[in-house]
């Protein structure tokens, strides 16, 4: 047994828990890291039969920990599925029933020459219904969330600063989270003295348009920025207080965009250009040539992030008392040129 106990659950869920967590001799509350990715099919991972995409870290979690083969998402779309996890409610009883966005009625503002809404986000979680971070906080945990929120629009009754999250960095709005080179991200940090959830402008990105060839000149890649914030938060944990980390990484949904590094290059050499994507300006999805290589690269990049989280826990000496859980919010998507049938990403009902 590895020092962590990993659990993977169906639609791709996996977890690892340390031996100390299972020991009656120790009353120490375990640390918990829940990594929830976005729109990954269970068939995207090698441990669930994927043959073309490299996922060594998640495959190792499955081998050394617990692999689930029967599990169900709360909903086929993002916000209500995440609400089911946060509230413990069936989506038929929960307050959040869909991906309803509030920004269409909001005034607009400019970031460079790019237009954005002054308010973005989804239906708020019911403030009278306790959610998972609040439960953890009441039980003595410090809490950090990095990635997608989708539990309330900016300035609403349900934003990270109002729901017992000590540190947040990522996207308030699930629609904004479809883009990897955004105009802004959101942050709430008690350590930085924030009193509310704020916007953090991507100063380099806003010099270039959201749609067209110049979009590729943007360099502030949100997936990496969010991951680095998560690692920095984890690096601050010293074992004196139990921690709950909710890493809601946006990979592999939705636009097929990422740095043209060794991960992507390896898949460009592996896959022919047999399917392209023309783009959709209304959705702000740009044209993609290497659709299959781009998607495969996003899965391997996510796997690399998971491996770095596990390595950080070991480096800090926290792996002996930490549970790590990995899952997806729901099944695969087709937006932005994704091709779930090509990779056999899920089964058909």
Language model features with spans:
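Conserved beta-strand->loop/alpha-helix structural units within folded catalytic cores of enzymes
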Residues: 37-39, 135, 139, 146-148, ...
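Active-site-proximal cap/lid insertion segments
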Residues: 27-30, 37-53, 60, 67-69, ...
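Bacterial Sec-dependent signal peptides at the C-terminal "C-region" and cleavage site
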Residues: 15-28
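A structural signal for short, well-ordered beta-strand segments and their strand-loop junctions
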Residues: 144-146, 246
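Active-site segment of extracytoplasmic enzymes that catalyze sulfate/phosphate-ester chemistry
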Residues: 23-24, 42-131, 135-141, 155, ...
